[in-house]
């Protein structure tokens, strides 16, 4: 896929986010923010037998953070929690499909950070 198609997909996820909202009685919930640009993300998961059966996010911020959250929530439904623990920066960059500069990298990685903190059961992200 060309960079233009990836950019279109990112813009579409930003303008029409998937899985945005809240779940009724989520099994996992975590919230965090990026103080440098004001992005905020809350991730909620429903889990059965160690598998994500539903996922949602809520928050606000730049196009990259919100689109990444939307794309990530779609991708993780049906995956085992143990697999989510192994997701990394490269996974997010592959998901986005375009080069992300250093300034926007924290924006792109915030949804993953929030997801992994929730899956690992952290009360707060270690500084």
Q: Where are the model-predicted features located?
A:
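Short beta-strand elements
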Residues: 34, 39-49
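A short interface-forming secondary-structure element
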Residues: 50-51, 55-62
């Amino acid at each position: 896929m060309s960079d233009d198609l990836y950019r279109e997909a990112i813009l579409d996820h930003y303008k029409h986010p998937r899985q945005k909202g809240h779940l009724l009685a989520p099994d996992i919930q975590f919230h965090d923010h990026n103080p440098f640009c004001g992005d905020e993300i809350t991730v909620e998961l429903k889990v059965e037998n160690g598998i994500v059966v539903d996922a949602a996010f809520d928050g606000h911020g730049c196009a990259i953070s919100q689109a990444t959250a939307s794309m990530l929530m779609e991708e993780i439904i049906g995956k085992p929690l143990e697999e989510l623990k192994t997701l990394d920066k490269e996974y997010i960059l592959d998901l986005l499909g375009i080069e992300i500069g250093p300034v926007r990298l924290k924006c792109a990685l915030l949804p993953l950070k929030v997801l992994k903190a929730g899956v690992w059961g952290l009360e707060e992200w270690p500084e």
